[in-house]
Amino acid sequence: MSIFSRRLQVPLPYVIAGFFIALIAIFVLASHLFTDKTWFGKEGLLWLFALGAVPGLVVALAQFILNWVEFGEISRIKRLGVQNMLLTRDDPNYYGKYMGQARQKINVMGVTSARFFQDFADVESPLERKKILLAALDRNVQVKILIPSSKHLQERHKEGFRVTKERCQRLKKEYPSLFDARLFDHEAVQALVQIDNEVIVGPVFPNKESKNTPVIHVSAESVFAQSYLDNFESEWNAAAPIDEE
């Protein structure tokens, strides 16, 4: 019969509440049947029940308060649009899963972005995950690269700048209406990657590799992200084409 193949779906809170009600009912029934104590007498069943239940209720209340405070803190962070925090930026898989789903734009701001091209635009690699940026361009995703001019780079970054410039020039020729790269006229102070509605941003320290610095992942619609995105647009509008250097 079809009735035996049906599944009954019950919300978990109802199951938990029903379990405790049944447990209390069993306790009350057992106390009434297997003891000679009355409910309201001196040290009766009600007193024994309260003596056992009150400490548990106090502990449960304390735990509830702690959880409520923690929930409030998490909610406050969520309202800021924070989705994740990473100790380092050296995880191409984290960026790659969003870039593989990009439909509108990818904006990148950093020191040289050499590692970005190595991870996602390696035309010689047989691995598709190394060509995620190229696949995004093939899907008509707009890509902007914004880095400082070479005169604002330390000597150890000059080679990375040269490689990035060559790759940007090649991509600009292949995707003239989709790809663009520009240079701003000061040292880099932040690293930013925007992939549609996802923004991953962090600081740039002069004497520390950017891949080893922390970042925060937020929604592009959040107030937190808006300042960084406004700064990117301002820097982009004032920057010079990478071909001019």
Task: Label each region the model flagged.
Residues P148-Q190:
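HKD-type phospholipase D/PLD-like phosphodiesterase module
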Residues D180-A220:
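HKD (HxKxxxxD) catalytic microenvironment of the phospholipase D
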Residues M1-A22:
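Juxtamembrane interface helix immediately N-terminal to a transmembrane segment
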